[in-house]
Amino acid sequence: SVGFKAGVKEYKLTYYTPEYETKDTDILAAFRVTPQPGVPPEEAGXAVXXESSTGTWTAVWTDGLTSLDRYKGRCYXIEPVPGEEDQYIAYVAYPLDXFEEGSVTNMFTSIVGNVFGFKALXALRLEDLRIPPAYIKTFEGPPHGIQVERDKLNKYGRPLLXCTIKPKLGLSAKNYGRACYECLRGGLDFTKDDENVNSQPFMRWRDRFLFCAEAIYKAQAETGEIKGHYLNATAGTCEEMIKRAVFARELGVPIVMHDYLTGGFTANTSLAHYCRDNGLLLHIHRAMHAVIDRQKNHGIHFRVLAKALRMSGGDHIHSGTVVGKLEGERDITLGFVDLLRDDFIEKDRSRGIYFTQDWSSLPGVLPVXSGGIHVXHMPALTEIFGDDSVXXFGGGTLGHPWGNAPGAVANRVSLEACVKARNEGRDLAAEGNEIIREASKWSPELAAACEVWKEIRFNFAAVDTLDPS
């Protein structure tokens, strides 16, 4: 019959197109789909494509007023996941016109919006995204990037060192600033606000900013090195967040910080633009990420959240440690660390990378390894992450038996020893303990640190693992 035909039709008739050849401008997504019993994979894959682009559950007459072929998502390949019954990777291509330029928020609202509550799927996880250069060019990305940061700080050829000030809640501003000063004076490059330090009754943000700035200037004067403190500008409103960033700029400090998932991508991108315009570096904390990324069969993989952050903007981001107390398997972690730092990353399923990603010269982001690490981990961290990283030791600095400054000294000595050994061609993986032991002979601070933490290990299997290939 001619004209509009009402009724429900199968998704796969419109949205499953195995013959489709992807375009260079398409955004490509890899979803891990677990269909409900009785739902064929083609129907499930097509449903993902439909519900995250143009589709609705029934035919509507306004479909006739547009060109579905131009705007619809297409499921173009489905492959079973090895070792899993009834789980598939569905590849979906989205036309570029379906997204607003320069908006991570809009990209996520489409791709990971309502579709995650869809009844025909038992579970759904976004494993990876291929962002085309045409879309990347609409983002400003990190305010400065790795090279500019090194030039600003005048620090080359080694990872940077930081320390989160603990206890995270309850210190007064003056005592907090004192802890910052001691760590910076001892040899760290940065100290850091904890992610949940914003502006609470025991320490309002303005007081904290002032005392931390004092600590920075005092430590700089005494060490001759450039120092910084990640001043957390995260706030309840965007206006308040920018107000805090403005005050940081007026104090002349080098870096501010934001919790990008709890604060949201819109706020984060606004802050990144402000930081670029005003010469502030931007440190990003990923609080709430595990809510989204920890389950293997549902949610969004962190490599996607990391790509989104590079688009939205940030100069540092926490990225797991491989060796500390928080989640992170080595190959997977190194996969998204490369996605953060490098300009071109080849598809590599052994590291969980589903697509080749070309960043077309968008600046890189420094990965921050933090969480349960201490001096004995330094050889492994130096070997795994290389020079372009920040290693943040909170308890691993402040927990030193002699105090904060000696804790900082121990970290700096162990780092310099590892970098020196590596530059001399020694194998950090094999000789790490020996390198630290040698250095501790002439550094009593390091020897004391080794004595305290020599037996500490967080040995649990990672929850998020690679599929058997």
UniProtKB/Swiss-Prot annotation:
Catalytic reactions on record: 2 (2R)-3-phosphoglycerate + 2 H(+) = D-ribulose 1,5-bisphosphate + CO2 + H2O; D-ribulose 1,5-bisphosphate + O2 = 2-phosphoglycolate + (2R)-3-phosphoglycerate + 2 H(+)
CDD domains: RuBisCO_large_I
Family matches, as Gene3D superfamilies: Ribulose bisphosphate carboxylase, large subunit, C-terminal domain (3.20.20.110), RuBisCO large subunit, N-terminal domain (3.30.70.150)
GO MF, one annotated term: ribulose-bisphosphate carboxylase activity
Gene designation: rbcL
Binding of substrate, residues: N114, T164, K168, R286, H318, S370
Modified residues (N6-carboxylysine): K192
Location in or out of the cell: Plastid, Chloroplast
Keyword Cell inner membrane: no
UniProt-recorded name of the protein: Ribulose bisphosphate carboxylase large chain
Highest taxon listed in the record's lineage: Eukaryota
Modifications made to the protein after synthesis: The disulfide bond which can form in the large chain dimeric partners within the hexadecamer appears to be associated with oxidative stress and protein turnover.
Modified residue annotations for N6,N6,N6-trimethyllysine: K5
GO CC terms: chloroplast
Keywords recorded for this protein, A-Z: Calvin cycle, Carbon dioxide fixation, Chloroplast, Disulfide bond, Lyase, Magnesium, Metal-binding, Methylation, Monooxygenase, Oxidoreductase, Photorespiration, Photosynthesis, Plastid
Binding-site positions, Mg(2+): K192, D194, E195
NCBIfam families linked: PRK04208.1
Cofactor binding annotation: Binds 1 Mg(2+) ion per subunit.
Organism listed in the record: Calycophyllum candidissimum (Degame lemonwood tree)
Site (Transition state stabilizer): K325
